[in-house]
Amino acid sequence: MTPANPKPLANHHIAVLLGGPSAEREVSLVTGAAYAAALERLGARVSRVDPGKDVAQVLTALAPDLVFNGLHGRWGEDGCVQGVLETLGLAYTHSGVLASALAMDKAKSKAVLAAAGIPVPGGGLFDRHDVAQGHVMPPPYVVKPNAEGSSVGVSLVFEGANGPPRQLAAPDWAFGEQVMVEPYIPGLELAVAVVGESNGPRALAVTEIRSSTGFYDYDAKYSQGGSIHVLPAPIPDAVRDRALHLAKLGHTALGCQGVTRSDFRYDDINDLLVLLEVNTQPGMTPTSLVPEQADHAGVSFDRLVFWIVEDAYARRFAGGIA
């Protein structure tokens, strides 16, 4: 993973996708900027692309050696932009079309993960209007858009609540007609970063996330001080090893490539570890988990970015980086 040359990407033209039209645009702008800066430090010529409807024409005109995907949310991590890049014949980073689409769809990804023997939450899909009208399961439970990331649109309904979140019935609700409703799992929030390597995926570490509000929502993820990351997580060795194993298994079961982040809940009273989801485009902001875990494993951010590029080239071209 360590480049011998301090400028190993000299003479390489890399287009970084950042921003985009999703609800996670602001996070993507920060992630993409971090990627672009690292690539420039590694010697690459970088074109920053905030994709719109003309993204195919823009990328065709740029003709980059590689597209570095720094997008989050719909269109950027659900298989759509990956399909565009496949059609254009461009090498790109992170997971491909099918894995991206599966991981973004909570219902489908849970089915795949469960079939692989991975513990996942119960619950199911409901029409958002039905959920807004009354409890579809006894509280506490969690309501999530079926195809969003970064906890966008997520609500926690506590015991004693008079009813479910009213915003589900709002005319300006923009997160799809179906929502995933799952029983709330008490305990610890854990995360594991995984990097795919030629001899199999490697899980970096286990982080415990402690939110200042008690709920790891969008603000807790991306606001300074919104959460505290405890690395390594203060959990028994057996639980750590189980989380590392399940994260690698989830990465493989969904067919992911490059880097992913698996999010877990651990009920420490009942010793229950549950995989919530696998993120194929994990954040790379100053408050993000993957760069922290890489650093903990002795991998600098620039080395991590170089590895992502190296992995993408190796998948597209037999000779890897020229």
From Swiss-Prot:
**Gene name, Swiss-Prot/TrEMBL:** ddl
| Residues annotated as binding ATP | 137-191
Annotated positions binding Mg(2+) 1: D263, E277
The free-text cofactor remark is:
Binds 2 magnesium or manganese ions per subunit.
> What does the entry list as the binding residues for Mg(2+) 2?
E277, N279
> What is this protein's name?
D-alanine--D-alanine ligase
Give the similarity note. Answer: Belongs to the D-alanine--D-alanine ligase family.
Q: Major place of localization?
A: cytoplasm
Function in brief: Cell wall formation.
Write down the chemical reaction(s) this protein catalyses.
Answer: 2 D-alanine + ATP = D-alanyl-D-alanine + ADP + phosphate + H(+)
The record's EC number reads 6.3.2.4
Q: What pathway does the annotation place this protein in?
A: Cell wall biogenesis; peptidoglycan biosynthesis
**What keywords are annotated for this sequence in UniProt?**
ATP-binding, Cell shape, Cell wall biogenesis/degradation, Cytoplasm, Ligase, Magnesium, Manganese, Metal-binding, Nucleotide-binding, Peptidoglycan synthesis
Q: Where in the cell is it found?
A: Cytoplasm
One family name in Pfam for this protein: Dala_Dala_lig_C
**SUPFAM superfamilies from the entry?**
Glutathione synthetase ATP-binding domain-like, PreATP-grasp domain
| One GO BP | regulation of cell shape
> Cross-referenced PROSITE patterns, in alphabetical order?
ATP_GRASP, DALA_DALA_LIGASE_1, DALA_DALA_LIGASE_2
Where do the ATP-grasp domain residues begin and end?
A: 110-310
GO-annotated cellular components: cytoplasm
The answer on whether this UniProt entry bears the keyword Manganese reads yes
Q: Kind of enzyme, top EC level? A: ligase
Which cofactors must be present for this protein to function? Answer: Mg(2+); Mn(2+)
Q: Which InterPro entries match?
A: ATP-grasp, ATP_grasp_subdomain_1, D-Ala_lig_Van_CS, D_ala_D_ala, Dala_Dala_lig_C, PreATP-grasp_dom_sf
Give a yes or no for keyword Manganese in this entry: yes
Q: What's one GO MF term for it?
A: D-alanine-D-alanine ligase activity
